[in-house]
From Swiss-Prot:
One of its GO terms (molecular function) is antiporter activity. It comes from Arabidopsis thaliana. This is Cation/H(+) antiporter 19. Residues 790-800 have a biased composition (Basic and acidic residues). The chain crosses the membrane at residues 30-50, 60-77, 92-112, 127-147, 158-178, 196-216, 224-244, 278-298, 315-335, 343-363, 375-395, 408-428. One of its GO terms (biological process) is regulation of pH. It is a multi-pass membrane protein. The gene is CHX19. Belongs to the monovalent cation:proton antiporter 2 (CPA2) transporter (TC 2.A.37) family. CHX (TC 2.A.37.4) subfamily.
Length: 800
C-alpha cells in the first residue's frame, strides 16, 4: 500500500486509545481519537467546498482535491502547530492505511461499473477517438518528461519517469466525465455517448499502462524483476478469470430478485477483494489492482451487484475516500513551485496536456466526420482528470519517480484541466433542444381515431400496477398502435456509483433509457414489456437520470420531442396501510409543480390508492367505475375528454356529475373583461357537454347527471356519496372555491386536494388533470423547428 514519506527520525508508534482528559492525557496523542478528528475535519471541509462549487457545476472530486491541498502544507499546513497537532507525522501511517483501504473498495466499485461486454461493442468511431486520445497525449507526455528530467527531476530513473508522465497526461477520468456530462445534460446526446464510450476504452488502457509503469519502477537491480512482476500480474488476471469469476457468478446465481442477499456471500466477496489486493501487493504491482480486477470479473447482472454496491459505496465514498484526497494533499506542497522556471514548467505541462488530448481527439473526430464544434467539445471532455490521475501521481511519488515539485505541478495540472472542462463546454457547446411542432397536445381532439401518445412517469415499482392498469383502461379499442406509451423512470442523479453505471449504459436512441445491467431481472422492465406483448399498446421504457432540481426539463423535453398529448406524474405521497397519506419527499413535490408550469401538453397527477389492487389486471377482468365531477373550465373539459377515452374500454363505467351551483359557491370573476371571459367559458362548457351527449362512444357505459349545490358542504357531501368508485378524474383548476383548509398541495387544485386528503374516506385513486393552454406563458424548453428531423416518428419502430 501507498504510505507517506517521512523524513528525519522515525516517530514512535501511537497507542490506540487514551484514558481521558481527566487523567491528563490528550486524545490527540492517541491513534483512534486523532483519526476520528481527521475524518470529521476532512469530510466537513470537503463537503463545504463541494457545496460552494455546486453552482459552478463542478464535480465533487474538484472540491476533494482542493480540500486536500488546502489542508496540507500548501495552506493550513504552513502552520507548524496545526500540522503537529492535527496531522502529526506519527499519525500519517494510520491515515494512509485507512485511506488506501477505502480506495481499495472504491476501485472494486469502479471495476463493477466497467462492463467489458459493452466495451467490446464500442463502435469504430469511438474506438478510433479513444486510441488517438491516448496515443498523442502519451507521446507528448514522453517529450515533456525529457524537459522535466533535465530541470526539476534530475537523477530519477528515466524509463519509469517517461511512462508515468505519459500515463498522467493521457488519462481520462471515466466517473468524473460521467458526472460532468450528467450535470450538463449531454449524456444521451451523440457527443455524450461518444465521450463515454471512448472514456471506457481509455480507462482500461490507462490501467494497463499504469501496471507497466509500476513494474518498471521497482527497486530491483535486475531488469528481470520487472519481467517477473508483469508475468505474475498476468497470471493473477488469468486466475481471477478462471477461479474468482466462477465463484462470484455462483453466489450471484443464488441471489434471486426480490430476496435478500446472504450475509455470507457479501462477507466472502469482501474477503476475496482484500485477498486479491494482498496478492497483487505481494507481486509488486500494487494492492489496488487486485481489487479492481475482482470488480471487473464480478457479475454485472442481477441483484448481487446492486446489493454489493449499496453496502459498500456510502461508507467508502462518503467517509473513507476523502481521506485519500487529504493524504494526497499532505504530500502536495504548492510552495515548491517557485521561480519563473517552475511556473513556466507548470504552464508547459498544462498546455502540452491540453494540446495532446484535444488535438488528438479533434483530429480523429474530424476523420470520423464529426462536426468541428462537437469535435472540440469532445476534446475538452476527454481532457477530464480525476481520482485515477491522483492514484498514478501518488504511486509515482511513493516510488520516488516523482519528486515534490513534479508531483505538485502534475496535481495542479489535473485540477486545472478538470476545473475548466465544465465552463468551456458550456461556452462552446449549447445543444439546441429542437423538436418538430405538433398539434395533438391535449386529449381533446376532433379525430378520435388519431394516435394518442402518453408519457407515463414513475419513481419506483410501487407506482407500476396502478399506472399499467390506468393505461389499460385508457387504451380503448381498435387498431394496434392507437395508444403509445413512453414509460419514464424518474431517477435522481446522485454521487452513487450505481447511478454512474446507469449513465454508462445509456444507449443510442436520443433519450435516456433503461440500464441494461438490470434489464433481465428488473421488475419494472418486466412489467412494461409483458404488458406490451399482451396488449395492442406500444410501450417504450425510458429513464431520466438527473438532479431533482432539473429533472422536469428532461420530462418536458422528452414530452415535446415524442409529441405526447399527456404527461402522467405520480403524486408525491402514497397511501399507508392505515389509509393516511405519507410523503416520499418534498423535492418530488417540487418536480410535479415545475412540470405543470413548463409542460408542452396536458398533465395528469395520479394519486395512487391502488387502482385494480397491487397487481396488473388482465383486460378481461378490468371493471372500474370512474367518476368525473364537472364544475367547468379548461381543465375539467380535458378531464372529461380523458374520461371519454376511457369509456371506450368495455370494462369501464363512467359517470359524469355536472355541478350546478348557486351564486357564491363557484368562483366569481371580476367585472369588465372577466365577466366576458366567464360567459365564454360557460358557453364552451355547455357546448362541450352537448357534444359529449351526442358522442357515439357514449354507450350504455356512460351516465350523466346534474347536481344542484348551494354551499361548500353540499359539494363535499355530494363527492362523498361518490366515494365507492375506483377512480376520480378531476380538473386541476375547477371553477370552485377551496374545499379544504390545507394549502400544501396546490398542484391538485381545490377538488383534488379534498379527494386526496386523509379526511376523505375512499379507496379510489384520483387523477388530477391540467389541460394544455396555448395562451399560457409556459416558457417552452424546446425550440420548435418545422424542418426538424424527428428520428423516432413512430413509436412502433422503436419497439419492434
Amino acid at each position: 500500500m501507498a504510505s507517506t514519506n517521512v523524513t528525519g527520525q522515525c516517530p514512535g508508534p501511537m497507542k490506540a486509545t487514551s484514558n481521558g482528559a481527566f487523567q491528563n492525557e490528550s486524545p490527540l496523542d492517541f491513534a483512534l481519537p486523532l483519526i476520528i478528528l481527521q475524518i470529521v475535519l476532512v469530510v466537513v471541509f470537503t463537503r463545504l467546498l463541494a457545496y460552494f462549487l455546486k453552482p459552478l457545476k463542478q464535480p465533487r472530486v474538484i472540491a476533494e482535491i482542493i480540500g486536500g491541498i488546502l489542508l496540507g502544507p500548501s495552506a493550513l499546513g504552513r502552520s507548524k502547530a496545526y500540522l503537529d497537532t492535527i496531522f502529526p507525522k506519527k499519525s500519517l501511517t494510520v491515515l494512509d492505511t485507512l485511506a488506501n483501504i477505502g480506495l481499495l473498495f472504491f476501485l472494486f466499485l469502479v471495476g463493477l461499473e466497467l462492463d467489458f461486454a459493452a466495451i467490446k461493442k464500442t463502435g469504430k468511431k469511438s474506438l478510433l477517438i479513444a486510441i488517438a486520445g491516448i496515443s498523442l497525449p502519451f507521446i507528448v507526455g514522453v517529450g515533456t518528461s525529457f524537459v522535466l528530467s533535465a530541470t526539476i527531476s534530475k537523477g530519477v530513473d528515466q524509463l519509469p519517469f517517461i511512462v508515468f508522465m505519459g500515463v498522467a497526461l493521457s488519462i481520462t477520468a471515466f466517473p468524473v466525465l460521467a458526472r460532468i456530462l450528467a450535470e450538463l445534460k449531454l449524456l444521451t446526446t451523440d457527443i455524450g455517448r461518444m465521450a463515454m464510450s471512448a472514456a471506457g476504452v481509455n480507462d482500461v488502457a490507462a490501467w494497463i499502462l499504469l501496471a507497466l509503469a509500476i513494474a518498471l519502477s521497482g527497486d530491483g537491480t535486475s531488469p528481470l524483476v520487472s519481467v517477473w512482476v508483469l508475468l505474475c500480474g498476468t497470471g493473477f488476471v488469468i486466475f481471477a478469470v478462471v477461479a474468482i469469476k466462477p465463484l462470484l457468478a455462483y453466489m450471484a446465481r443464488r441471489c434471486p430478485e426480490g430476496e435478500p442477499v446472504k450475509e455470507l456471500y457479501v462477507c466472502v466477496t469482501l474477503t476475496v477483494v482484500l485477498a486479491a489486493s494482498f496478492v497483487t501487493d505481494t507481486i509488486g504491482i500494487h494492492a489496488l489492482f487486485g481489487a479492481f480486477v475482482v470488480g471487473i470479473v464480478a457479475p454485472k447482472e442481477g441483484p448481487f451487484c446492486r446489493i454489493l454496491t449499496e453496502k459498500i459505496e456510502d461508507l467508502v465514498s462518503g467517509l473513507l475516500l476523502p481521506l485519500y484526497f487529504a493524504a494526497s494533499g499532505l504530500k502536495t506542497d504548492v510552495t515548491t513551485i517557485r521561480g519563473a522556471q517552475s511556473w513556466g514548467l507548470l504552464v508547459l505541462v498544462i498546455l502540452t496536456t491540453c494540446f495532446g488530448k484535444i488535438v488528438g481527439t479533434v483530429g480523429s473526430s474530424m476523420l470520423c466526420k464529426v462536426p468541428f464544434r462537437e469535435a472540440v467539445t469532445l476534446g475538452f471532455l476527454m481532457n477530464t482528470k480525476g481520482l485515477v490521475e491522483l492514484i498514478v501521481l501518488n504511486i509515482g511519488k511513493d516510488r520516488k519517480v516523482l519528486n515534490d515539485q513534479a508531483f505538485a505541478i502534475l496535481v495542479l495540472m489535473a485540477l486545472f484541466t478538470t476545473f475548466i472542462t465544465t465552463p468551456i463546454v458550456m461556452l462552446i457547446y449549447k445543444p439546441a433542444r429542437k423538436g418538430a411542432p405538433y398539434k395533438h397536445r391535449t386529449i381533446q381532439r376532433k379525430d378520435h381515431d388519431s394516435e394518442l401518445r402518453i408519457l407515463a412517469c414513475f419513481h419506483s415499482t410501487r407506482n407500476i400496477p396502478t399506472l399499467i392498469n390506468l393505461i389499460e383502461s385508457s387504451r380503448g379499442t381498435g387498431k394496434k398502435g392507437r395508444l403509445c406509451v413512453y414509460a419514464m423512470h424518474l431517477m435522481e442523479l446522485s454521487e452513487r456509483s450505481s447511478a454512474i453505471a446507469m449513465v454508462h449504459k445509456a444507449r443510442n436512441n436520443g433519450l435516456p433509457i433503461w440500464n441494461k445491467i438490470e434489464r433481465s431481472t428488473d421488475q419494472m422492465v418486466i412489467a412494461f414489456e409483458a404488458y406490451q406483448h399482451l396488449r395492442a399498446v406500444a410501450v417504450r421504457p425510458m429513464t431520466a437520470i438527473s438532479g431533482l432540481s432539473s429533472i422536469h426539463e428532461d420530462i418536458c423535453t422528452s414530452a415535446h420531442q415524442k409529441r405526447v398529448a399527456m404527461i402522467l406524474l405520480p403524486f408525491h405521497k402514497h397511501q399507508r396501510m392505515d389509509g393516511a397519506m405519507e410523503s416520499i419527499g418534498h423535492r418530488f413535490h417540487e418536480v410535479n409543480q415545475r412540470v405543470l408550469q413548463r409542460a408542452p401538453c396536458s398533465v395528469g397527477i395520479l394519486v395512487d390508492r391502488g387502482l385494480g389492487g397491487t397487481s396488473q389486471v388482465v383486460a378481461s377482468e378490468v371493471a372500474y367505475k370512474v367518476v368525473i365531477p364537472f364544475f367547468g373550465g379548461l381543465d375539467d373539459r380535458e378531464a372529461l375528454a380523458y374520461g371519454m377515452k376511457m369509456v371506450e374500454h368495455p370494462g369501464i363505467t363512467l359517470t359524469v356529475y355536472k355541478f350546478v351551483a348557486a351564486r357564491g359557491t363557484l368562483k366569481r370573476f371580476e367585472k369588465s373583461e372577466h365577466d366576458e371571459k366567464e360567459k365564454k367559458e360557460k358557453e364552451t362548457d355547455e357546448e362541450f357537454v352537448r357534444e359529449l351527449m351526442n358522442d357515439p362512444r357514449g354507450n350504455e357505459s356512460l351516465a350523466y347527471e346534474e347536481r344542484v349545490v348551494e354551499s361548500k358542504d353540499d359539494i363535499i357531501a355530494t363527492l362523498k356519496s361518490m366515494s365507492k368508485c375506483n377512480l376520480f378524474v378531476v380538473g386541476r383548476n375547477a371553477a370552485v372555491a377551496s374545499l379544504v383548509k390545507s394549502t400544501d398541495c396546490p398542484e391538485l387544485g381545490p377538488v383534488g386536494r379534498l379527494l386526496s386528503s386523509s379526511e376523505f374516506s375512499t379507496t379510489a385513486s384520483v387523477l388530477v388533470v391540467q389541460g394544455y393552454d396555448p395562451a399560457a406563458d409556459t416558457r417552452p424548453l424546446v425550440e420548435e423547428d418545422a424542418e426538424y428531423d424527428q428520428s423516432s416518428r413512430d413509436i412502433s419502430d422503436l419497439t419492434a
